[in-house]
């Protein structure tokens, strides 16, 4: 998955089941025809013309963990567990605001990928349970 650089409220999500764009502004999900390159880690679709959208996930890549506003997420691992014969550690993700205040936003088995949109107004996380989106609401 990856956020559009030109349209930062649009998130491309590619799975074995389907390819979609999630609109972080209105919550709509649109099925798309997209092509992606697992080596270059980019996706293209006619829904986001003239753009190679960077993607990250099971094949590599990384979404940004910092915002232009000075916020960030910090990822750490704790408590080993054996699940289906594999040793896994719980992953904890902490959101740190620009003043240094910390809030735990995720504790679970490791996510596949997470990160902010280019404008820092959306945060997405994908794990075995699905895709989770947090959106900044300015009052």
Regions found by a protein language model. Name each.
Residues 1-139:
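WD40-repeat beta-propeller superdomains and closely related acidic/aromatic-rich repeat-like regions
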């Amino acid at each position: 998955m990856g956020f559009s650089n030109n349209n930062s409220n649009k998130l491309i999500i590619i799975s074995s089941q389907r390819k979609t764009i999630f609109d972080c502004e209105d919550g709509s999900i649109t099925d798309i025809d997209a092509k992606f390159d697992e080596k270059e880690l980019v996706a293209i679709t006619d829904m986001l013309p003239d753009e190679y959208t960077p993607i990250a996930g099971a094949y590599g890549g990384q979404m940004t963990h910092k915002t232009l506003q000075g916020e960030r997420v910090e990822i750490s691992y704790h408590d080993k567990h054996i699940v289906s014969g594999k040793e896994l550690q719980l992953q904890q993700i902490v959101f740190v605001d620009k003043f240094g205040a910390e809030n735990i936003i995720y504790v679970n088995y490791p996510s596949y990928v997470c990160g902010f949109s280019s404008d820092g107004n959306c945060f997405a996380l994908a794990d075995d349970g699905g895709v989770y989106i947090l959106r900044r609401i300015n009052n």
